[in-house]
């Protein structure tokens, strides 16, 4: 079996994807697999045809990789692949759609308001609507970006127009959420129809917020296992993570990010990553390690889950 690790790509998360792809490629080589690394570009269909792979290990993040696009191409070409399918991928990458599903399923998520624009937006009108709907502080997000790209924290009325403008440079949609102060926790989920939640991780950023720099610079964030929260809150997060994974129809592996409000004794789902980072500073491999699963074994497990029910 020839495996192609598809990485790089055309999104703003290209650099992270190359690092993820490289780590996966080396792990599969160590395990003795016949493996090639494929840097995705506009000619990906021709490359896949030329390489004639039997299985694709998707290591792409963001646009065209995590949104159902590459999954659709692989389905057409009859190449089985790792992770979630077209629908789950396209739903999970869209934070607004994810929140609608979470609300419908009764899974706690921060209150929000969403906007969509085709023409010049009226920043004052948007600011006014946000202030009528939510209390400050708020978090403004580009709904289809990952790696904490396109996120602005707003603490005063005066900051709103500038923050809105900044996020709209990235996306034509806006997701505005209430800011929940608490403990940031992530749940790594592994499996298909019977998913398992690996040990929860508390994220402590050395910068003010867990942003792109804190996420990918060694030493700028700390991963604490188990999180320093009450056991019943950990249990809630595990239950909501599994429920979220199933509600979106995820497969293989995914990471569900939470904000834990200790005062309200609640775990709020923020978002779902259907292709979590697999770099040296990544959360998913850390959770697996805490469960006694080596990086190489984790990569092989994800590969096996991708093959389950998908062999040619």
Swiss-Prot record:
<feature type="domain" description="ATP-grasp">
    <location>
        <begin position="99"/>
        <end position="304"/>
    </location>
</feature>
<dbReference type="Pfam" id="PF07478">
    <property type="entry name" value="Dala_Dala_lig_C"/>
</dbReference>
<feature type="binding site">
    <location>
        <begin position="131"/>
        <end position="186"/>
    </location>
    <ligand>
        <name>ATP</name>
    </ligand>
</feature>
<keyword id="KW-0460">Magnesium</keyword>
<feature type="binding site">
    <location>
        <position position="271"/>
    </location>
    <ligand>
        <name>Mg(2+) 1</name>
    </ligand>
</feature>
<dbReference type="GO" id="GO:0009252">
    <property type="term" value="P:peptidoglycan biosynthetic process"/>
</dbReference>
<dbReference type="InterPro" id="IPR005905">
    <property type="entry name" value="D_ala_D_ala"/>
</dbReference>
<protein>
    <recommendedName>
        <fullName>D-alanine--D-alanine ligase</fullName>
        <ecNumber>6.3.2.4</ecNumber>
    </recommendedName>
</protein>
<dbReference type="GO" id="GO:0046872">
    <property type="term" value="F:metal ion binding"/>
</dbReference>
<feature type="binding site">
    <location>
        <position position="271"/>
    </location>
    <ligand>
        <name>Mg(2+) 2</name>
    </ligand>
</feature>
<feature type="binding site">
    <location>
        <position position="257"/>
    </location>
    <ligand>
        <name>Mg(2+) 1</name>
    </ligand>
</feature>
<keyword id="KW-0464">Manganese</keyword>
<dbReference type="InterPro" id="IPR011095">
    <property type="entry name" value="Dala_Dala_lig_C"/>
</dbReference>
<dbReference type="InterPro" id="IPR011761">
    <property type="entry name" value="ATP-grasp"/>
</dbReference>
<keyword id="KW-0436">Ligase</keyword>
<keyword id="KW-0961">Cell wall biogenesis/degradation</keyword>
<keyword id="KW-0963">Cytoplasm</keyword>
<comment type="pathway">
    <text>Cell wall biogenesis; peptidoglycan biosynthesis.</text>
</comment>
<dbReference type="InterPro" id="IPR016185">
    <property type="entry name" value="PreATP-grasp_dom_sf"/>
</dbReference>
<dbReference type="GO" id="GO:0071555">
    <property type="term" value="P:cell wall organization"/>
</dbReference>
<dbReference type="Pfam" id="PF01820">
    <property type="entry name" value="Dala_Dala_lig_N"/>
</dbReference>
<comment type="similarity">
    <text>Belongs to the D-alanine--D-alanine ligase family.</text>
</comment>
<comment type="function">
    <text>Cell wall formation.</text>
</comment>
<dbReference type="InterPro" id="IPR013815">
    <property type="entry name" value="ATP_grasp_subdomain_1"/>
</dbReference>
<dbReference type="InterPro" id="IPR011127">
    <property type="entry name" value="Dala_Dala_lig_N"/>
</dbReference>
<dbReference type="GO" id="GO:0008360">
    <property type="term" value="P:regulation of cell shape"/>
</dbReference>
<keyword id="KW-0133">Cell shape</keyword>
<feature type="binding site">
    <location>
        <position position="273"/>
    </location>
    <ligand>
        <name>Mg(2+) 2</name>
    </ligand>
</feature>
<dbReference type="GO" id="GO:0008716">
    <property type="term" value="F:D-alanine-D-alanine ligase activity"/>
</dbReference>
<dbReference type="GO" id="GO:0005524">
    <property type="term" value="F:ATP binding"/>
</dbReference>
<dbReference type="GO" id="GO:0005737">
    <property type="term" value="C:cytoplasm"/>
</dbReference>
<keyword id="KW-0067">ATP-binding</keyword>
<keyword id="KW-0547">Nucleotide-binding</keyword>
<keyword id="KW-0479">Metal-binding</keyword>
<keyword id="KW-0573">Peptidoglycan synthesis</keyword>
<dbReference type="InterPro" id="IPR000291">
    <property type="entry name" value="D-Ala_lig_Van_CS"/>
</dbReference>
């Amino acid at each position: 079996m020839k495996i192609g690790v598809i990485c790089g790509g055309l999104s703003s998360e290209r650099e992270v994807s190359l690092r993820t792809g490289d780590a996966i490629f080396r792990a599969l080589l160590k395990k003795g697999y016949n493996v090639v690394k494929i840097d995705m570009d506009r000619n990906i269909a021709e490359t896949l045809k030329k390489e004639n792979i039997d299985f694709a290990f998707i290591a792409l993040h963001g646009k065209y990789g995590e949104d159902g696009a590459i999954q659709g191409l692989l389905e057409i070409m009859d190449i089985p692949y790792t992770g979630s399918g077209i629908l789950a991928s396209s739903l999970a990458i869209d934070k607004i759609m994810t929140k609608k599903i979470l609300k419908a399923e009764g899974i706690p998520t921060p209150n929000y308001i969403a906007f969509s624009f085709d023409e010049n937006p009226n920043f004052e009108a948007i600011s006014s609507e946000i202030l009528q709907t939510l209390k400050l502080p708020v978090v403004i997000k580009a709904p289809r970006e990952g790696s904490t790209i396109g996120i602005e924290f707003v603490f005063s009325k005066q900051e709103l127009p500038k923050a809105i403008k900044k996020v709209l440079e990235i996306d034509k949609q806006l997701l505005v959420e209430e800011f929940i102060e608490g403990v940031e926790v992530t749940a790594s989920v592994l499996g298909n129809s019977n998913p398992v939640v690996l040990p929860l991780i508390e994220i402590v950023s050395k910068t003010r917020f867990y942003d792109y720099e804190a996420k990918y610079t060694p030493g700028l964030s700390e991963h604490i296992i188990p999180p320093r929260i009450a056991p019943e809150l950990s249990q809630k997060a595990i239950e909501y993570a599994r429920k979220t994974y199933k509600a979106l129809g995820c497969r293989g592996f995914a990471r569900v990010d939470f904000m834990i409000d200790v005062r309200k004794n609640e775990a709020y789902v923020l978002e779902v990553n259907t292709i979590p980072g697999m770099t040296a500073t990544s959360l998913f491999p850390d959770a697996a390690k805490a469960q006694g699963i080596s990086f190489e074994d984790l990569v092989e497990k994800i590969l096996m889950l991708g093959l389950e029910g998908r062999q040619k």
